[in-house]
A protein has these predicted regions:
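Charged (often Lys/Glu-rich) extended helix/loop segments that serve as interaction or gating elements
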Residues: 1-106
Length: 106
């Protein structure tokens, strides 16, 4: 799954990366704490590492994907790859909170 960073909220020990993807697009982490590897779409050179919590824009405590420490520095509008979302991504997706289902390209 490819998603875009819409906002980065600075925190005390970690920053919150708000993505345009949400729990309605990928329900597995919210449903049963499934882990999906998160990667930047572009690797940056340098040693600048940060701690991030990757979350969706829905105001739900379960709308979160992962917490990663020592991730490369990110900026708003960067693209993020969420790996191994599987064949059941679309069937588990919903229109929760009046959000459209994700676009699926085969």
């Amino acid at each position: 799954m490819i998603t875009k960073i819409i906002y980065i909220k600075e925190g005390y020990k970690k920053d919150f990366v708000i993505l345009d993807a949400a729990m309605n697009d990928l329900m597995r982490p919210a449903l049963y704490s499934a882990y999906h590897k998160i990667l930047p779409s572009k690797k940056t050179k340098g040693i600048s590492k940060k701690s991030y919590e990757f979350v969706g824009p829905i105001c739900e405590s379960t709308d979160r994907f992962s917490i990663i420490s020592k991730f490369q520095k990110l900026e708003e509008k960067d693209l993020i790859i969420i790996r191994d979302v599987g064949a059941y991504g679309m069937s588990l997706s919903s229109n929760y909170n009046v959000r459209p289902k994700p676009i699926e390209i085969l």
